[in-house]
Amino acid sequence: MNIKSAEFVDRVKIFVKAGDGGNGCVSFRREKYVPKGGPDGGDGGDGGFVFLRANPSLSTLIEFVNKRKFFAENGKHGMGKKMKGRNGRDLYIDVPVGTVVKDASTGQIIADLDEPGKVVCVARGGRGGRGNAHFSTPTRQAPLIAEKGEKGEARWLELELKILADVGLVGYPNVGKSSLIARISNARPKIANYPFTTLVPNLGVVKYGDFSFVVADIPGLIEGASEGVGLGNVFLRHVERCFVIVHMLDVSGFEREDPARDYFIIREEMKKYSPFLLEKPEIVVANKIDLLEREKLPQRIKEIESSIGKEVIPISAVTGEGVDLLLDRVASIVRKERIEREERKEKKDHPMEKPAPVWRKLPERFEVEVVKEEDGQWVVEGEGLRVWMERFDLNQRDARLLILQILEKNGLEEKLKEAGVKEGDVVRIGNFEFEYRE
């Protein structure tokens, strides 16, 4: 279950774009012996949605290094005979379990995909536009108007992988974390006597009787880690998911002279990164007791316990002494935390419902602006007007009439006069131009 450094990527940015809705159709029924067929333009199909899905077979975000942009399918346009266009296919993007999804522009967390199969919608498709069959009235029996489909949502996302491990091993480099994980699990990490031997989190599955749990060796913690010194700020996020923290100290005195000082430095770095980390259950272990004279061990452990105010379990990752006691303590905490997690999950667990497609309500009231451009042409603008123009095609006669009616209701005539528009001046609305007549 080791993660090779060449393949381990735990933070990326991706762009997602949902499909646009298909346009409604302008069509009229034309059949022999049906002289008054009437409008039969069908609706456009909805655009495809974009979902992220937690896949337990993935362990890294490496797939997103070379492919960062993802697009769902657009809805198909409506057709005659009131035939609705096909909806665009939804796009499912698989990510590792434990991926936190954030809006890249705001930093807001959208979802935490912390369970296999968990799904979140990150971009909604646009609703398909209505065909002209919807616009028939007693006074407009042959409507030359249909709606354009809504644009699908688009956004940049930040994906941040937080490893799902039950136990996090923390401590200064070379205190023996990799040696311990190699002894108690199936992991075979690289072990050497120099700082930052471990460059990525090592994961190991520990089988303890009929119980099993996952342990993660969190690399690179030194003073200043929370601010980017060493590798700690890169990997501290992986501690956040652990049920229990095993804080390892070097008690031999050969490399680390003051284990108590080391303990407080690491705890301070964890606090700076997230005070929440200090609330997690913690087991403190003193490693490398095989390198210490036996008669000095009890006094050494007592001094450390007195300094940090916590019980310390003496172990040797090399010989295995004390490891069974450590595993018994760890397994007890993990069992308890898993039960509590399942109880919390049952209370809030509910299936995800697919949200409605994007469909903006057309504003009835809005501000109208008349602006004179450098070429002397007058342009009608307004946020509400923009929504109407995005919904309808001004090349369609009835669409132009409808928008002009809405503009009249919102004071277009008065705005034109206030701006100084004179008879014969050219006024533009979108891509449509007309001469002003009083």
Swiss-Prot record:
Keywords: Cytoplasm, GTP-binding, Hydrolase, Magnesium, Metal-binding, Nucleotide-binding
Occurrences of domain OBG-type G (ranges): 165-335
Top-level EC class as recorded in UniProt: hydrolase
InterPro entries in alphabetical order: G_OBG (IPR031167), GTP-bd (IPR006073), GTP-bd_Obg/CgtA (IPR014100), GTP-bd_prot_GTP1/OBG_C_sf (IPR036346), GTP1-OBG_CS (IPR006074), GTP1_OBG_dom (IPR006169), GTP1_OBG_dom_sf (IPR036726), OBG_GTPase (IPR045086)
EC number(s) per entry: 3.6.5.-
Keyword GTP-binding: yes
Cofactors (names): Mg(2+)
Entry keyword annotation includes ATP-binding: no
GO biological process, one term: ribosome biogenesis
Residue ranges of domain Obg in the record: 6-164
An annotated GO cellular component: cytoplasm
Residue sites binding Mg(2+) per the record: 178, 198
GO molecular function: GTP binding; GTPase activity; magnesium ion binding
Binding site for GTP: 171-178, 196-200, 217-220, 287-290, 316-318
Compartment(s) where it occurs, according to its Swiss-Prot or TrEMBL record: Cytoplasm
Function: An essential GTPase which binds GTP, GDP and possibly (p)ppGpp with moderate affinity, with high nucleotide exchange rates and a fairly low GTP hydrolysis rate. Plays a role in control of the cell cycle, stress response, ribosome biogenesis and in those bacteria that undergo differentiation, in morphogenesis control.
Family: Belongs to the TRAFAC class OBG-HflX-like GTPase superfamily. OBG GTPase family.
HAMAP family named in the record: GTPase_Obg
Subunit structure: Monomer.
Official protein name in the record: GTPase Obg
Taxonomic path: Bacteria, Thermotogati, Thermotogota, Thermotogae, Thermotogales
Gene name linked to the record: obg
